[in-house]
Amino acid sequence: MTHPQPFIAVIPARLASTRLPNKPLADLGGKPMVVRVAERAREAGAQQVLVASDAQSVLDAARDHGFEAVLTRADHPSGTDRLAEVAAAFGWRDDTVVVNVQGDEPLIDPVLVRDVASHLAAHPACAIATAAHPIHDAADVFNPNVVKVALDAQSVALYFSRAPIPWSRDAYQPHWPDVAAMPAPAFPVYRHIGLYAYRARFLRTYPSLAQAPIEQAEQLEQLRALWHGERIAVLITESAPEAGIDTPADLARVQALFQPGSK
């Protein structure tokens, strides 16, 4: 009998969202969004679930529902930086697996969270694990808001990009620049899923790593790890996860799912 990989789930949550203010505290069926996310992390089997925020109201909401919460600085440029502060404060062992569960994804699949943690444990040469799924629609391949990842033979990330990678010269070149005429990909193209598992030793070193030119160009923070020589293992799933909440329309859609009688 195999035992699940032990891991810690950290949920970075900040109130200062420009498109949806006070997002972590938005009501979903009588509970704040951040609590719904924490419940998913607990269902995934995390040994410890921590809500990390710079807002006392978010910490209070988590604690009121029985979850641990830790106050972090307000000036973090990314969720990874917030995780790094938490990892340093708790002094976890180097090989501790820490999963960053986004605070605006109350519908995230607990199985995916658990599987990404296990995927990192199964790849000792990697500092990070994440996930991706196949893209079947040409429009997604050419959409810069859809982040693509190119993989090596061991499904370790070679590069993440908003551009269409890999570029199929024979399939795409005859139609360029008419994106609407592009055929569906006849080879594997993968969309990155923004769920990460980290080794604690990497999180402690992350704040000291200089930003990478490719990170700044693409506006993708995972490129900093690749730039500095770290390896990222990628778990391939068959389908896309439920979308997170970024806008009032997203919130209304998810709130409807938490109404009594909804399925």
From Swiss-Prot:
It is found in: Cytoplasm. Pathway: Nucleotide-sugar biosynthesis; CMP-3-deoxy-D-manno-octulosonate biosynthesis; CMP-3-deoxy-D-manno-octulosonate from 3-deoxy-D-manno-octulosonate and CTP: step 1/1; Bacterial outer membrane biogenesis; lipopolysaccharide biosynthesis. One of its GO terms (cellular component) is cytosol. It catalyses: 3-deoxy-alpha-D-manno-oct-2-ulosonate + CTP = CMP-3-deoxy-beta-D-manno-octulosonate + diphosphate. The keyword Cell division does not apply. InterPro entries: Cytidylyl_trans, KdsB, Nucleotide-diphossugar_trans. GO terms for molecular function: 3-deoxy-manno-octulosonate cytidylyltransferase activity. One of its GO terms (biological process) is CMP-keto-3-deoxy-D-manno-octulosonic acid biosynthetic process. Keywords: Cytoplasm, Lipopolysaccharide biosynthesis, Nucleotidyltransferase, Transferase. Its EC number is 2.7.7.38. Activates KDO (a required 8-carbon sugar) for incorporation into bacterial lipopolysaccharide in Gram-negative bacteria. Belongs to the KdsB family. PANTHER family: 3-DEOXY-MANNO-OCTULOSONATE CYTIDYLYLTRANSFERASE, 3-DEOXY-MANNO-OCTULOSONATE CYTIDYLYLTRANSFERASE, MITOCHONDRIAL. This is 3-deoxy-manno-octulosonate cytidylyltransferase. It comes from Burkholderia cenocepacia (strain ATCC BAA-245 / DSM 16553 / LMG 16656 / NCTC 13227 / J2315 / CF5610).
